[in-house]
From Swiss-Prot:
Family: Belongs to the universal ribosomal protein uS11 family.
Gene Ontology CC terms, in alphabetical order: chloroplast; ribonucleoprotein complex; ribosome
GO MF entries: rRNA binding; structural constituent of ribosome
Organism per entry: Thalassiosira pseudonana (Marine diatom)
Primary location class: plastid
UniProt keyword terms in alphabetical order: Chloroplast, Plastid, Ribonucleoprotein, Ribosomal protein, RNA-binding, rRNA-binding
Protein name per UniProt: Small ribosomal subunit protein uS11c
Subcellular location(s) per record: Plastid, Chloroplast
Entries under Pfam families matching the protein: Ribosomal_S11 (PF00411)
A single BP term in Gene Ontology: translation
Quaternary context: Part of the 30S ribosomal subunit.
């Protein structure tokens, strides 16, 4: 029988990165938090789905809080102390994610909203009727 080779997990080496960038993408169905260094290389990430939530509960503020805490604690272990926050989207987990990043121990330097707004571009989807 052929030998099975297991891929070893890549260990995050602790370097004193100092400053990082937190990207929060908040949609109505999910919240994704990615922490990168200043050049854009991913250090840690978490989403509501990867934090154990399924279905409609992924879009809740509590799920966003859990995902942000998970990513922030992971980034703290690699040596990041201060962050700039870039928020994209209009989901319900925006403010909660920012608060939980601050509560995890990361110092926030700036918060920017980079939600893309069309200058009357594509036609929107059909309106939802309830």
């Amino acid at each position: 029988m052929a030998q099975k080779f297991r891929k070893q997990a890549v260990k995050k080496n602790r370097t004193n990165l100092g400053t990082g960038v937190v990207h929060i993408q908040s949609t109505f169905n999910n919240t994704i938090v990615t922490i990168t260094n200043m050049s854009g290389d991913t250090i840690s990430w978490a989403s509501s789905g990867s934090s154990g939530f399924k279905g409609a509960r992924k879009g809740t503020p509590f799920a966003a809080q859990t995902a942000a805490e998970k990513a922030a604690l992971d980034a703290l272990s690699t040596g990041i102390k201060t962050v700039e926050i870039l928020v994209k989207g209009q989901g319900s987990g925006r403010e909660t994610a920012i608060r939980s990043i601050e509560g995890a121990g990361l110092e926030i330097l700036s918060i920017q909203d980079i939600t893309p707004v069309p200058h009357n571009g594509c036609r929107p989807r059909k309106r939802r009727r309830v």
